Amino acid sequence: MRTETDMVRQDEVWKGAALVDRFLDGVRGGIPFAAEQIDVMLRVVAACGAPVRRVADLGCGDGILTRALLAAYPAAAATLVDFSEPMLTAARARLADRVPPPRFVAADLAHSVWVEAVADRAPFDVVVSGYAIHHLPDARKRTLYGEIGALLAPGGMFVNIEHVASRSGWIEAISDAAMIDSLHAFHTTRGAGKSREQIADEYVHRPDKAANILAPVEAQCDWLRALGFADVDCFFKVFELAVFGGRRPA
């Protein structure tokens, strides 16, 4: 796990097409409970009961979360933000058939300037993020959550599907084993022929591992509460995979 004292940003690896292709083709489909995480996101958004007219997807990757939101709210205007051009290219392809067409924004969540790039589309009824914010130092995570809160409409919902820190190395090892088992099952289903040992070696030595700055979900929920979010909770958690968030008070 990377610490905040590191001087060199490690998440720049996600700007490379090779890593993006490897993740989208060989990893993302093997994430445990991925469908359930998206279902939880949609249920929480629906429970707010307010019209969903504008949505933002931060660290959007290939747009999988936006695709799910627009399937439920087809008239919504979507804004997708990522600093990785290969990810944005994949998102454009995934969402090419959407009307109204989404806006794709190349911006870095590590710096507050991203807010200026989306401010004209605010306020947002829903802001989501999936497996992106854990690349930021904790101080920046907290600041980003405040920026998100300021961009939400009254009653608007923020949902973060995220890789979070375990409380001990023992729990982390269980989480890693579960992830490796899930990836192995995914590749076996595709007929890839990789052994569990090969999958484990690739997972342990993956090039993006150093980019992770994980924080406990409990701490992140506390940050949201301190920033004024309401109804903050962890809605789903299996080992290091969590869905959490809160609402801007109406």
Predicted segments with their positions:
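Conserved class I S-adenosyl-L-methionine
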Residues: 2-50, 64
